[in-house]
Amino acid sequence: MKLDRMRVGSRINDEEAMPLTAPESRARDSIDSSSTASISLTLVEGASHATTEPSKPAHNHNGRTQGNYAEKYRDDLEEDWEENNYIPTNGKSSQRRTLIVFWLLVALCVGGWAVAFLFFVTSPGNKTSTSPHSGSNSPEGDVTKPGIPATGKKIPLDDAIGGVWSPAEHTISWIAGAKGEDGLLLQKSEGGTGPYLHVEDVRNIHGTQSNNNSIVLMKESVFFVNDERISPEKVWPSPDLKTVLAMTREKKNWRHSFTGLYWLFDVETQTAQPLDPDAPNGRIQLATWSPTSDAVAFTRDNNLYIRNLTSKSVKAITTDGGTNLFYGIPDWVYEEEVFEGNIATWWSLDGKYISYLRTNETLVPEFPIDFYLSSPPGYSPKPGEESYPYVQQIKYPKAGAPNPTVSLQFYDIEREESFSVDVKDTLKDDDRLIVEVIPGSKGKVLVRETNRESYIVKVAVIDANKREGKIVRSDNIDEIDGGWVEPSHTTTYIPADPSAGRPDDGYIDTVIHEGYIHLAYFTPLENPKPKMLTTGKWEVVAAPSGVDLKNNVVYFVATKESPIDRHVYSVKLDGSELRMLKDSDKSAYYDVSFSHGAGYMLLKYQGPQIPWQKLISSPSNADNYIEILEENKKLAKLSNEFALPSLHYSTITVDGFELPVVERRPPNFDETKKYPVLFQLYGGPGSQTVNKKFLVNFQTYVASNLGYIVVTVDGRGTGFNGRKFKCIVRRNLGHYEAHDQIQAAKAWGKKPYVDKTRMAIWGWSYGGFMTLKTLEQDAGETFQYGMAVAPVTNWRYYDSVYTERYMHMPQNNEGGYENASISNATNLSQNTRFLIMHGSADDNVHFQNTLTLLDKLDILGVHNYDMHVFPDSNHGIYFHHAYKMVHQRKYFNLSFLGH
């Protein structure tokens, strides 16, 4: 869900079928990231669905210990609004719009609460001293002061949440040349100057040099088929760059999936034809290039087809797909929780086989979502039924309910036949999740599966040529450290190359090693014991980010300097020469994306100071190329004009664990005053909110404009502090996390500059659950106020894949589910006041969660809460711009002041 990475040797981003473009500048000067009207050049988000070389994974965090699997971090219950504010790093246009509305909603919802809270904290009897004083009662740890004068202007709320402070970012779509050339990217011209779609050498990104590697793919932004004018919305060039797969008329489905009309555009003739000439208006769910560029596999109406480019014929690979059977694409829960994308079709590297997932959700129960004010486009109720709500039925497996059953199928291109491969000792169908499929060379395929409670993990090697397979790795994570494994998307296939010192095929994986997540190299494929590439009391994060196969160098991002920092490192495939990228600072947060052959990289400095981006050659590349792509001069200018809070990084010790903390202090902070404190949290398993990223958001506004102290604590269960720190929450979500927030609040309440009678906490989604769990456990002793948005209140109501990973099935952990639910209404009644908000059409955290809690409150006659329901709003609560009403209402005036 987070940042995307292009796979090594691939032309696609596997998380989603690629949106067409992300705004880019032609010059070094910064651009306004909220305006693209004057931009004439953009870089295409994705290039092809064909995987023609060993893959590089998406950004995540997996691990194992000496051959034992670990996990990657996923915020399944959030939309990454806190971290990315308004500008997502992946450049996806449709997702960006969703995140914009989502973040605006979050901030404005809480804005109404915080502004009203201001009336409370500044009311008679709550005044504090304003005399200036330079004291020494400050927390220990790093202090980030961006050089902003305390007398600067205050940040308007609309600016803090509206993208004005979002760093300008550039997303590069790296692409391999037709002959494997490195350092190429896909570009799209917006302003009518130059060709519409072309491949360019990264060293000529501004178009100032002539270069033989430049290839024009589409001269114009439109093409015609039978006199129909067609404007492509997404494009994927073939690996040989002779044909472009174009999509139009996109319709969103779930978070990552969509449908559209697909076309084949011939680069030489600049003409196009339907992907399926016999069904040009058929809505296609997914289309992927063959690595040999001579065929496209696609799914339509849940059936898998193949189109051979040498003819206009389309062959059906499956025919029984329908409401409950999916071929080549995931169902809802696999898209959301397992693959984090819409792809379940994989070509072999030689183009001879297609691997595809068969998903059967016949036994999965349906959950109804009622829409009282809206309905899908084209829906017309029967006469006389206009007053009834539209009901959408979703196949949604809740904890303990039947999951979809899956199996991996194969299609032999030459023989035109489908087949399956029986592998001995695999998990039973009703207890199996297929979480990763990695095509290799010579018909080999790596398949990773887990049990539904995500603690038994098996890796199989299947030989499609011989139609046989075997389990080569098997581990029980529960026996290793009591933890879990999450779906992996980072495994990287390493082909044999005796001339480069690699006699056998292998793969790079992330493993748990001595309690931390590290890189390991398995070779040959059947070897269960890896060569450890990294070790130590720190963790790899994006692993690997790139692989230079010519020089046997692996690049990755890690927390070696500090859990809240990110730096780029390299290591040899033999485990030697571990080095930090020389451009890195000691205290910083970096991200990176690599070219096809890892000879070039887009290095992104993301904080704590003003972010910048550079295109540079990799250390293993003698080119010594460097290009400053973004300096964010506009953002630097803003930072000199406005008064921002100072950020104080520290740790606090709770039960022997060191918890990362960031405290945002108002400008002109005076230690003789007594400040109200707002705790903001997310806290989901493996997540991280305290880091060194530059971020101006709603929390900044609260500290800067309202004069509060805003504290964020990453308690136990969060990521990047080792397995012991994280896995302690297993089977008992909410207990340790809430305890840590309370202990942190008590520690802050003892500080001389904190008014411990005015402490509040708030969060969204998992953060909403954590807010209520903290208020429940605290029973009014430390926190007086809270706000929970779209909270989980009973883990039996959330989806099975996510929930059982941390809680096991309810049948196997009844007491844990009871403890993790929000059920102690008596304790909640001890708080001064709390607010619950939820959208009635939330398809992620169902409204059922809030209704169940309300019933408990009603039974015990609890009155110290308020409730706001947003009709027809989903998890983002933006139907009819509902956030505006939240922002305008005087809720906390009435709650705190009584008028």
Curated annotation (Swiss-Prot):
Feature: compositional bias, Low complexity: 32-43
Catalytic activity line of the entry: Release of an N-terminal dipeptide, Xaa-Yaa-|-Zaa-, from a polypeptide, preferentially when Yaa is Pro, provided Zaa is neither Pro nor hydroxyproline
Annotated glycosylation sites: 212, 308, 360, 819, 824, 827, 893
Classification via PROSITE patterns: PRO_ENDOPEP_SER (PS00708)
Cytoplasmic side: 1-99
Enzyme Commission number(s): 3.4.14.5
One Gene Ontology cellular component: plasma membrane
Residue intervals passing through the bilayer: 100-120
Side of membrane Vacuolar, spans: 121-899
Membrane topology note: Single-pass type II membrane protein
Active site: 765 (charge relay system), 842 (charge relay system), 875 (charge relay system)
Function in brief: Type IV dipeptidyl-peptidase which removes N-terminal dipeptides sequentially from polypeptides having unsubstituted N-termini provided that the penultimate residue is proline.
Family: Belongs to the peptidase S9B family.
Protein name, as recorded: Probable dipeptidyl-aminopeptidase B
Organism expressing this protein natively: Trichophyton verrucosum (strain HKI 0517)
Lineage: Eukaryota, Fungi, Dikarya, Ascomycota, Pezizomycotina
